[in-house]
Amino acid sequence: MSEAELEQTPSAGHVQEQPIEEEHEPEQEPTDAYTIGGPPRTPVEDAAAELSASLDVSGSDQSAEQSLDLSGVQAEAAAESEPPAKRQHRDISPISEDSTPASSTSTSSTRSSSSSRYDDVSEAEEAPPEPEPEQPQQQQQEEKKEDGQDQVKSPGPVELEAQEPAQPQKQKEVVDQEIETEDEPSSDTVICVADINPYGSGSNIDDFVMDPDAPPNAIITEVVTIPAPLHLKGTQQLGLPLAAPPPPPPPPAAEQVPETPASPTDDGEEPPAVYLSPYIRSRYMQESTPGLPTRLAPRDPRQRNMPPPAVVLPIQTVLSANVEAISDDSSETSSSDDDEEEEEDEDDALTMEHDNTSRETVITTGDPLMQKIDISENPDKIYFIRREDGTVHRGQVLQSRTTENAAAPDEYYVHYVGLNRRLDGWVGRHRISDNADDLGGITVLPAPPLAPDQPSTSREMLAQQAAAAAAASSERQKRAANKDYYLSYCENSRYDYSDRKMTRYQKRRYDEINHVQKSHAELTATQAALEKEHESITKIKYIDKLQFGNYEIDTWYFSPFPEEYGKARTLYVCEYCLKYMRFRSSYAYHLHECDRRRPPGREIYRKGNISIYEVNGKEESLYCQLLCLMAKLFLDHKVLYFDMDPFLFYILCETDKEGSHIVGYFSKEKKSLENYNVACILVLPPHQRKGFGKLLIAFSYELSRKEGVIGSPEKPLSDLGRLSYRSYWAYTLLELMKTRCAPEQITIKELSEMSGITHDDIIYTLQSMKMIKYWKGQNVICVTSKTIQDHLQLPQFKQPKLTIDTDYLVWSPQTAAAVVRAPGNSG
């Protein structure tokens, strides 16, 4: 069946129309219908008629009106020849026609539907349009476009349609009488448009350019090709056979076929289909690269097809400034050339540096202050160093290392003079200078050295006291019997005994209480060698941060992790099993695989979310070793033993629905000859100043009371440990003396038995509060009720935030037989 016969076949959504021209003018040629009700024929129209006649002679199955309508050049010329008429409405419906068999590459059903949907083009020129409102028709067309939006391939060619003059009213009435149903498009109707002439002229979209002087009745419509299954119900109901689709065009030669990538994983462009037309082929190649999305809605004829704007990104400079793009015709360009050249001369060596320690971006220049420091030239040289808080301190450069930052490849390990070693760390070169004014911070000078009359070591103090006693022996007057002699509050002159020499016990207590660092001269040869080795090993810490649970903690001291782990900048430690890793990916994988959610051992205390676990070092040796390695990052003078058998570990945890999170711990020997109840105690920095330290101290003394011994922590204590213990001791003693301020006197022995604190610790604490005096060769406590109340009001002696409730403690002291296993027993 030819396409001319299909035009008379009703399709889905259309009603078969009767040839109206035959009823009114049966003898008139089809080409004359184009001029009904219109102006006289022009030479262009005569040429169109001749062209249609030639098409009919050549065997074309299309009418002259259709061929004329599909000629873009002739339609444009006809529109120019006609006088501009008043535009009543704009028809934006997509109209197209299958003109050549070579362009039909779809199935038979697709061709039939496209022909039946738009075969009314020629009939619309012959018959007047139906009196149907414009707005509903546009809404129906928009609904069809939305239904077929998911099946859009690419935009089709642009066609021109010239609106014809209105037909006589009589002919319009005849059409209304014959058509019983509205010509509404069916929901199954799909638009199918191919190229006008794929292999000839007009195949390029640039050939169809809208003349800006064209009358407004010329509409540019963009049509899309929608591949979808069609249902030609009207044709099937009539029983009309469908024509077989024409054979596809022959494939091009082998040399025209693009080469296939050698590898299926090749990232090269995919070759286009060989049966596509040149225009579709070019569009296919353009769409294979990222571009703008395909426009589905028809464009306005007055809209220009502009290329996408060029993406102009701001230029990121070393000063983090956004430089805007300026046009070539700007007058400011020539005036600022000289200024830019001067700035380039000044900033020749301007680079960016990202400080890994302070997480700040700084600008470095080529001045001498940014040059590399040679530590070997002057190891004891003192520099000015800016800390992270902005203060400038005097310090010493101890070590250097190379970083991944190309702009500032060197970092330096510095020690601040007069500050604790836990504040040492790695800093960038821009934070070190010979002049404090170059760093731009508040300069903090170290504490002044001790006065000549104040000893720096116990040996010097003993020498000064001996000289003072010899000089004042002849001038000393007899003291009154009732005069009270309080110990001095100053730690360096605590013992006010001008007529006595300091004993070895007093010297040891003085060094322990004040954490006096012994000089190498006071140590034996073996001890001095070990101390020097310890300082050389622990002087430099390479692990800057510790990722532990939800916290990233800055480390304080050196810890002897293995070589590859000890030099890592960030160490990742699982908070449940204490396994350490170097890489974040390994840490994330381990957290997913680790099934432990609490420390090993048994839980001996639980109140609220506070839990304490007792872990035997002999049973869980690996876990205890890992715990000690991690604790060494925050403890200076801590001795690590690979033999964990003699120790018990008490781990304090906060428990929630995810598990038990380690807060701190303390360890103790199973059997101590000196009755030490704490060998090592630590609260992690994120949990400090929350009362957990005093809670662990109180728990250790509670265990000592249950064992029936009076315990004390191992000495020396760190600076933070000494403050915590002194605060706990002071509050405990004040609470005991608060109810005993009667005429009878309380003794140090009674306080020791009630509190579990040793005599030496009680004397040290009362001396710091000026509540003890030395009278007739013994220490006597002399306090009043007002003195106790005044001390309890001080912030350092306030009540602890957390206390131990013995009702929740499930623990009994272990006997010697349980601690030390009898020989010969296995297991």
Curated annotation (Swiss-Prot):
Start and end residues of each MYST-type HAT domain: 538-813
GO biological process: DNA damage response, signal transduction by p53 class mediator; DNA repair-dependent chromatin remodeling; dosage compensation by hyperactivation of X chromosome; positive regulation of DNA-templated transcription; positive regulation of gene expression, epigenetic; sex-chromosome dosage compensation
Region Disordered, residue ranges: 1-190, 237-276, 288-309, 324-360
Matches recorded under CDD domains: CBD_MOF_like, NAT_SF
Pro residues bias: start-end ranges: 243-253
Crosslink site: Glycyl lysine isopeptide (Lys-Gly) (interchain with G-Cter in ubiquitin): K372, K483, K532, K539, K715, K749, K776, K798, K801
Gene Ontology CC terms: MSL complex; NSL complex; NuA4 histone acetyltransferase complex; nuclear chromosome; nucleus; polytene chromosome interband; transcription regulator complex; X chromosome
Binding-site residues for acetyl-CoA, renumbered to this chain: I681, R689, K690, G691, G693, K694, S718, S727, Y774, K798
Sites bearing N6-acetyllysine, chain numbering: K638
The keyword Acetylation belongs to this UniProt entry's keyword annotation: yes
Protein name (database record): Histone acetyltransferase MOF
The gene coding this protein: mof
